[in-house]
């Protein structure tokens, strides 16, 4: 655990120290688990935190709030430049830990995460060998140009074109109209030298010469000179302007005027155009979007990072802040964390933070397994399931993380509105994730479409399961994350009581019982949509797109239910794995993790009661019991709240918060930052003598 000498010399808040003394588990042991049981990662993290705390500029995150857009970007470039030293010392692990330890986002993250995920997924081995080291060593800077000013989530509808010129063996990229302008492209506004452009692939027919559209494909394009960084001929590029947040990142626009690139610039791991202009298609149509799935995998994994910061600030502040006495005899006011409505604002999101950590870990492993199978054997068995889950999980986890940060901000009352709390900046920098790489209100449709495919397969008798998933081949077994659809179809249990009795469980709040409730709920929602579609068609409505559109709300909710099940299953599986190895995880930790799992599950049930009651699988009395149990779990977790957020081991510079510092010096820090801000340097504001003073001296 990281504890710099500066923290040791600070006065410790007695309330926080008392909270830490109440812990029922080892904080350092849980921290070890959160770092993949790897001492090397912890040591690297500690060195990076020390590096950050010792830097005169990076260690003062509160100063960001007083900078202009240009000054913010200049600061971000300075912080980015320090990454070179980190990478030299610690390699790629150090790079990732540096990003996670910073208060602000920096431009290099686009090259290292977004571009790198896409390039490594889509580039051939030859292209990787020829180009990737240039981006890795920051000789080139990459970006990912898919979204257009007129098209976002509808990737098939993008308007940028890439025409194969057979006479020269080149491609020609073009922006045919205003709405084809690439827009919102991270890192492109000022920094990127190259970008991956998604464009409609047009190839002349060998028979009549007419252009045939093969759909969106990725191409690597140099946009700026390596000598003076100016835009290359035919390239119009710039920054899109101020945003709600994320302003240290240069989101850009791009227009192309018949720009020629070599045929070899088509990213061709899965598809290519040969010298004769013949298109060699991918084994699976969704392989074109492998890069996008890679970026989503990173977003899914990193939702934990932002949410852990928010709950750390909210919980520490809530144990220090005191308001109202329980009765006149009390000497002190009550900690606001003691109030049940405050617990309800924060504790579910603390539980969600841990759930999302283990979910991100699982999905990252599954993505790596899928890409390995595709690259080595052209095996697309895992792709459909992974693509569907990435769509729904990205939607669920980014939106609920945004909601969690906002709930934590609100839990801090008026001080949560101050930028000095660290929460408004955290939220405004994160909230764009709901729209990035697929709008979160549209992506769930891809998930539900896949779930309906699995249901149709099960109903037709093809429900044999394995640890793999079906792609477009009906002979392949269904996958692990959707196996419950077949299980529920085959199940003889009419209600949860029969399941509890059969499994020999002691209560509906047992994790196995809760997991079963989520499996049944998801199955019922999938089946309900299938029945609604069938009913419409039986009544003569053959307009499938319109039926689908009319059911969009239910479709999105169905995806959410499936993904919440995925999260709970991931969390529970990891707890079982940890508990099976007593040498690496003590029973005290598995106990508190199970309490977090139960809290998260019951909280979701309470928020979606109609789903769980609709077919009488659960009794009303059991729902009432679950509602009361939630408050009991809050009380069980109460002594461990501060220790749980301490296990994230977030340093003060990372949080950038007067409310959430490790030693709890809230009020003096808040006053110090307020009183020393630049706006208070002069007693008279600019313009006072010209505008206000004449009014004071006038005789109106």
UniProtKB/Swiss-Prot annotation:
Obligatory cofactor(s): FAD
Subcellular location(s): the record lists: Peroxisome
* Catalytic activity, reaction form: a 2,3-saturated acyl-CoA + O2 = a (2E)-enoyl-CoA + H2O2
Q: List the disulfide bonds.
A: none
The Gene Ontology CC terms held by the record are: peroxisome
A single Pfam family, by name?
ACOX_C_alpha1
- On whether Lipid metabolism is a keyword of this UniProt record, the answer is yes
Sequence similarity: Belongs to the acyl-CoA oxidase family.
Recorded protein name is Peroxisomal acyl-coenzyme A oxidase 1
- Whose protein is this, by species? Dictyostelium discoideum (Social amoeba)
